[in-house]
Design a protein with these regions (language model features):
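Cap/lid segment of the alpha/beta-hydrolase catalytic domain
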Residues: 58-145, 194, 200, 335-346
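Alpha/beta-hydrolase-fold serine-hydrolase catalytic core, especially in secreted/extracellular enzymes
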Residues: 17-46, 174, 258-274, 278, ...
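Alpha/beta-hydrolase fold nucleophile elbow
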Residues: 147-159
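A short loop-to-beta-strand scaffold at the N-terminal edge of the catalytic core in hydrolase folds
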Residues: 43-56
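Accessory cap/linker subdomain of secreted extracellular hydrolases
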Residues: 81-84, 93, 115-118, 125-128, ...
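Short glycine-enriched nucleophile-adjacent loop
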Residues: 143, 162-173
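Sec-dependent N-terminal signal peptides
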Residues: 3-13
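Short beta-strand immediately N-terminal to the catalytic nucleophile in serine-hydrolase-like folds
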Residues: 155-157, 182, 292
Length: 394
């Protein structure tokens, strides 16, 4: 019998530490960090729920490291410390002021949520907002109200948070000195996630938009499944029996996710789709940029290259623009050691190497002025087959 794994999608990605490592991390955070929760006002009056983890050691100053996400910044409550968070635990030990924010309209943040909110390059009034302005306003508030910082900030995020990171580097706040968009969705409806070269990714879209509206703060304290009972683990049979595509909404999604219908209504690459292409707005980028992706990413491989190529083409003044590609699935560089993909062995702990020798040194250099081994000027690529890292300066 033919069996296919039922669904794959771009989910929030975090380092999946073993139980003992997660326990040690939680103990480290409790001993060394204080958690604060804020409602940060935006220029239009909407308040965004923001969690800030500040080092207890006040003998020195620290940079901000921010992640903006639609998936929630729980566990909620100032006494609840996370067992896993982006980026790697090495950052917590290095010392940063970590900022995790629910984006506009999600979880505990006010306002209206829009998928891949279009960028507004002509803001004239307080009501003219986008993800770039929300990032700017958040950082502006943080540098004015959170003590103990060194005046510099970075951003990092994978997948959807990678999109928000890419938005944040556009018209960036002066404090934002380094960003790392990782597997960022750059053109949501042509290349990333929803459609690949125009083809609708049914399995990915179906489960993602079935799960996404259900996410809420209470789920962090619940073991309830995000998925309905599909009746079978066999994806091929499920979609074969589903019948017309309209049945997906009628039987399962039940109109809980308007963006599903938006995709049905905009099958061509029309103005609705073009407005969600971030590429035309990636220009004059001021922060240093470390774009990261995996060769085996089924969701946002295109966005990784879109991001790097646009910065290269439009921002010669950018202090650093490097792309890193490894033998990883979507977000695979953030979890595990990266020594293998299924039965295929790479004879190298590629993810460990990336986190320890690339990601952390990038932010340490740009946000703290730490002298680190220089990255190549253009690209760091893992070559499968020969199983070695290759450096490119052009």
């Amino acid at each position: 019998m033919r069996t296919i794994v039922l669904f794959m999608l771009a989910l929030p990605v975090a380092a999946q530490a073993p139980v003992d490592e997660a326990k040690a991390l939680k103990e480290h955070l409790l001993a060394n960090y204080t958690k604060f929760e804020y409602a940060i006002p935006m220029r239009d009056g909407v308040k965004l729920f923001t969690v800030v983890y500040t080092p207890k050691d006040t003998s020195k100053t620290y940079p901000f490291l921010m992640t903006r996400t639609p998936y929630g910044v729980g566990p909620y409550g100032v006494d609840a410390m996370p067992l896993r968070q982006l980026p790697s635990p090495a950052f917590w030990k290095a010392g940063y002021i970590f900022v995790h924010q629910d984006v506009r309209g999600r979880m505990k943040s006010e306002g209206q949520f829009l998928h891949a909110r279009p960028h507004n390059p002509s803001k004239k009034a307080a009501a003219d907002i986008d993800e770039s302005s929300d990032t700017f306003d958040s950082l502006d508030w943080l540098v004015k109200h959170v003590p103990g910082h060194n005046g510099k900030a970075g951003m990092v995020g994978i997948s959807y948070p990678g999109f928000y990171t890419a938005c944040g580097m556009i018209d960036a706040h002066p404090a934002l000195k380094a960003v790392s968009p990782q597997a960022p969705l750059i053109d949501y409806l042509d290349g990333d996630d929803c459609r690949h070269n125009g083809a609708f990714l049914l399995a990915h879209n179906f489960r993602f938009f079935g799960m996404f509206p259900k996410l809420n703060p209470k789920m962090y304290a619940s073991k309830d499944s995000r998925d309905p009972d599909y009746g079978t683990p066999d994806g091929y049979k499920f979609f074969l029996d589903l019948g017309p595509l309209s049945n997906a909404d009628q039987k399962y999604l039940k109109k809980a996710e308007p963006f599903w219908q938006d995709q049905m209504d905009h099958g061509d690459y029309d103005d609705f789709c073009k407005a969600r292409d971030l590429r035309p707005h990636i220009k004059n980028i001021q922060p240093a940029v470390l774009t990261v992706g995996g060769w085996y990413d089924a969701e946002d491989l295109a966005g990784t290259f879109y991001c790097y190529e646009r910065v290269k083409a439009t921002s010669p003044q950018c202090p650093q623009n490097v792309i890193v590609m490894g033998p990883w699935v979507h977000g695979g560089w953030a979890r595990g050691d990266g020594d293998a993909l299924g039965p295929v062995k790479f004879n190298a702990k590629t993810a460990d190497y990336y986190r320890e020798k690339v990601e952390l040194p990038f932010f340490e250099h740009h946000l703290k002025g730490v002298a680190t081994d220089p990255l190549p000027k253009a690209a760091l690529m893992f070559e499968t087959g020969t199983n070695r890292w290759r450096r490119f300066d052009t």
